[in-house]
Each structure stands twice: as structure tokens, then as C-alpha cells.
């Protein structure tokens, strides 16, 4: 599976055996004391940490327990990860004030449109950070983003991601059990996201 993914993405590989993960990119997967998760814990929302596009992929037997993330969508609907049971879930942490987030949005929308049109068992959910509801809604409408997003709740939702959202943007691909199967720290391209989602879909139930 790993060799198949590497060939598709055509980027350098760093094996992190202790973590049971495959990190693809120019730097190792790591946490940062100034990360948005750390800011969420401290209540400090002064800035953000921008990632370099590092990709981490976890084999099925190396994945942790399902996420318990929950929140309220920008439309006011309660939502939780368990609602996406038996579907591959893509979570994207974003803010309209974040340049890399804005740049990657069309790529996320492209993949979402293609997968939903094909009837694939996939759900996308944005996780907004630091925007008011009206500001976030206006941004999504202006950019024709059709998948939903959770409201910012002062960073509490980010804490449910267990330190996996260390940069803005961060994209997580969860398997059908709600476990993190892949992470992109920084902007993600349509080709990369499509490849990651396809690999998780190919695992079956």
C-alpha cells in the first residue's frame, strides 16, 4: 500500500518506524508549542503556524482509536464524527484569514465534487478556526464551497483532534471507523487528496 501511494504522489519518503507512519515531504512530522492546538489549550489565538505540506500516512494496524470530535455546523446543525460512520471522512482545519487555506479551498472543492458526483461513500467537513459564523459563511458562499464546516468554538473542537492539527491548514483523512488514516500539514493539492482518499476507500469496511 505504501509503495503504491509513494508512486502516485512522487515525493521523497521519510520512514518514521517508531510512530508506525509514513511521512512524505521535506520535514519530519512533528508538533510545535506554537501550534493551533497549543493555542486552543491556552486560549491564545494571536497567529497561526503554516505547514509545509508534509504528508503522514498510517497503516490500519497503527491507527489510534476513533476520534470523538463534535460541534455545530455553520448552518446551526449538531454534528459528530460518528455521523459519518461507514464513510471515509475528510476533515479540513481552515480560516478565511489564512492565505494557504484560501489557496487550497478550490482543490478540496474539486475532490469533493468529483467524489460526491460518483456516489462514493465519502464526507467532507471543514473545521473553522477563529472566524465568526457570518464571516465564514460569506467566504464559503463567495468561493462556491459546497461541503459543510463546523463553527469555531474557541478551539475546543481542535482539542478533540489530539494534537493532529498543528498547522493551518491541516487536512485529516479518517477511515470508515473514524480513525486517522492520513494527515497533510499545510496546503493539499487535489491530486494528493484524491490519492489519499482513494487508498483509504480501497481498504473496504
Where are the regions a protein language model picked out?
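Thiol/disulfide oxidoreductase modules built on the thioredoxin-like
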Residues: 139-146, 152-205
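Short, ordered coil/turn segments that flank beta-strands lining enzyme active or ligand-binding pockets
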Residues: 27, 74, 176
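N-terminal targeting signals for export/organelle localization
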Residues: 1-68, 204-205
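Short active-site neighborhood of thiol/selenol oxidoreductases, capturing the structured segment around
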Residues: 79-102, 108
Amino acid at each position: 500500500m505504501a509503495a503504491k501511494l509513494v508512486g502516485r504522489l512522487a515525493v521523497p519518503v521519510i520512514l518514521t518506524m517508531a510512530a508506525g507512519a509514513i511521512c512524505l515531504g521535506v520535514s519530519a512530522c512533528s508538533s510545535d508549542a506554537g501550534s493551533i492546538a497549543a493555542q486552543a489549550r491556552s486560549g491564545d489565538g494571536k497567529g497561526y503556524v503554516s505547514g509545509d505540506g508534509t504528508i503522514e500516512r498510517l497503516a490500519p494496524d497503527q491507527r489510534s482509536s476513533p476520534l470523538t470530535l463534535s460541534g455545530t455546523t455553520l448552518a446551526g446543525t449538531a454534528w459528530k464524527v460518528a455521523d459519518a460512520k461507514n464513510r471515509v471522512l475528510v476533515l479540513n482545519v481552515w480560516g478565511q484569514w489564512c492565505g494557504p487555506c484560501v489557496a487550497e479551498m478550490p482543490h478540496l472543492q474539486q475532490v469533493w465534487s468529483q467524489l460526491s458526483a460518483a456516489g462514493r461513500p465519502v464526507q467532507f467537513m471543514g473545521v473553522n478556526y477563529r472566524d465568526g459564523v457570518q464571516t465564514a459563511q460569506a467566504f464559503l458562499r463567495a468561493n462556491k464551497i459546497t461541503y459543510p464546516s463546523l463553527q469555531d468554538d474557541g478551539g475546543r473542537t481542535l482539542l478533540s483532534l489530539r494534537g493532529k492539527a498543528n498547522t493551518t491548514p491541516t487536512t485529516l483523512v479518517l477511515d470508515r471507523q473514524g480513525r486517522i488514516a492520513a494527515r497533510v500539514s499545510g496546503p493539499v493539492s487535489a491530486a494528493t487528496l484524491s490519492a489519499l482518499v482513494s487508498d483509504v476507500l480501497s481498504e473496504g469496511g
